[in-house]
């Protein structure tokens, strides 16, 4: 659509002051406005070319007229209708000029430069009439008919009305295809960004993912969630990959919630996304309003132990009738340093699961700010109790029992280290004894102890100092069993610190004097010297214990090497796995011998065949020579000579 804009000469007097900047729009042939003009002509049936607000470019342009001439022209078109005041005349001119009537053609002196959207300047020209139009509260009034004497009667029917209607309707808005194309406002609509639709996030604005795809959420009443109401959970730091629990498993699974059109908002989405991905707050050990689970589910039989952390009670569970060991903290742990140790023990138990040489964990809960842990009950008590009893009666663990202790606890450490964890508090009071006559089943590693070992099972317990090998948070244990490198805060060989403590534990079980907590003797032990043992041990076992407390942690054997040491695997104590290994080795040797035997047999057979073939060849050669001799003719014989003479 093309435009021709002609600036009229500045008018004079009051009309010039009111409409000094308006321009007339003249459309070129073939424009869309000609269709409007045709529709207006069809609707009115009597409008002429001079009644149209749009003129052909070849038609003569009206010259500037005075206000008196404009008033006379309006009186001529609407007889009997006189404006009461110049202000009313201006209002009438504005309405009729915007409506496309003849007054628009005759009011060239009042025109602004009204431009079509997308052409010319990007902002309209503000004129006094435009300001008057915006400031007033009137609306265009429909005419009662062509003969209406009101000054607001426009006399121009709407193009969309039926041309056959005797009383055609008149437009209540300027008869333009798009009202906004007239640009009668001072400024265009400000583009709204996504941020302009921001609203305060509440639980009612966040819908479940995908709820708006298949049904109306308002009608369906689909349940909603609030990220602030999400139940809190603890994050176990001893799982194989604790970081992926929030970045992989949750960030991928939970995405931003969908918002409806009225509340769609990037800031709200980002706020919710950050709230979702933020690590969950840790649940602390607080007072519970629930009824005591300890008294409800368990019946306390006796107190079987006490330590720095708390007391251990022997209890029977009312539901299954089995005996369990319930550890209860002595004092409230909420907000204390011991709270982290209690949680660390629960985390470690949950990750390690079930192993024949680790005390089994069942459950844990908090009551009145106290932590309670339900563990496996070991009927033999702790190794410390056994050592104390032996010391009282002046008896000791035999060498066979010491080897069994070293082997079983070594297997437990091998399992803990395989989970990338370290115990960091191996000592006699943390090793428990379970006496049973039931043969032990094959463990996860395929190890099965013999009947003697099954009568006494040594299990590692008290996991309050467990930490990860890769990212250690070391809480130093008993100084009597603490390796020197840990005291120096060298955490590069933490599994070897458990080996060091295990060697001293075996020394205590062998009958040695109580270990020092500090002093010269303490440093002598860290230099690789064993404490004095009141019984005579084999040289092999003594050397093994010395290697286990070597000052250089790299020289100490790992738990994997320890459980396969030849000293611990005697003929009467070899595991089924070791016996199978030896059996397979013997089978392999037998197979090699069988192959060698087959090769020797094949070689002998080939040699016999070669000898037989050689004999046949010799016999064939002699027979051939004899045949040749018998067929020879003329040897030692007179040959007949015939001669013919012609």
Swiss-Prot record:
It catalyses: L-tyrosyl-[protein] + ATP = O-phospho-L-tyrosyl-[protein] + ADP + H(+). SMART domains: S_TKc. GO terms for biological process: cell division; establishment of cell polarity; microtubule cytoskeleton organization; mitotic cell cycle; negative regulation of G2/M transition of mitotic cell cycle; neuron projection morphogenesis. Phosphorylated during M and G1 phases. Also autophosphorylated. Phosphorylation at Ser-642 by BRSK1 and BRSK2 in post-mitotic neurons, leads to down-regulate WEE1 activity in polarized neurons. Phosphorylated at Ser-52 and Ser-123 by PLK1 and CDK1, respectively, generating an signal for degradation that can be recognized by the SCF(BTRC) complex, leading to its ubiquitination and degradation at the onset of G2/M phase. Dephosphorylated at Thr-239 by CTDP1. Dephosphorylated at Ser-52 and Ser-123 by the serine/threonine-protein phosphatase 2A preventing its ubiquitin-mediated degradation. It is an enzyme of class 2 (transferase). Residues 120-130 have a biased composition (Polar residues). It is found in: Nucleus. GO terms for molecular function: ATP binding; magnesium ion binding; non-membrane spanning protein tyrosine kinase activity; protein kinase activity; protein tyrosine kinase activity. Acts as a negative regulator of entry into mitosis (G2 to M transition) by protecting the nucleus from cytoplasmically activated cyclin B1-complexed CDK1 before the onset of mitosis by mediating phosphorylation of CDK1 on 'Tyr-15'. Specifically phosphorylates and inactivates cyclin B1-complexed CDK1 reaching a maximum during G2 phase and a minimum as cells enter M phase. Phosphorylation of cyclin B1-CDK1 occurs exclusively on 'Tyr-15' and phosphorylation of monomeric CDK1 does not occur. Its activity increases during S and G2 phases and decreases at M phase when it is hyperphosphorylated. InterPro entries: CC_SR_Kinase (IPR050339), Kinase-like_dom_sf (IPR011009), Prot_kinase_dom (IPR000719), Protein_kinase_ATP_BS (IPR017441), Ser/Thr_kinase_AS (IPR008271), Wee1-like_protein_kinase (IPR017164). Residues 32-42 have a biased composition (Acidic residues). Binds 2 magnesium ions per subunit. It comes from the Eukaryota. Mg(2+) 2 binds at residues 341, 464. Transmembrane segments: none annotated. The keyword Cell membrane does not apply. This is Wee1-like protein kinase. Its EC number is 2.7.10.2. Its main location: nucleus. Its cofactor is Mg(2+). The modification Phosphoserine is found at residues 52, 78, 85, 123, 127, 137, 139, 150, 165, 269, 306, 311, 642. Mg(2+) 1 binds at residues 430, 462. The active site is at residue 425. ATP binds at residues 304-312, 327. Residues 27-174 are annotated as: Disordered. One of its GO terms (cellular component) is nucleus.
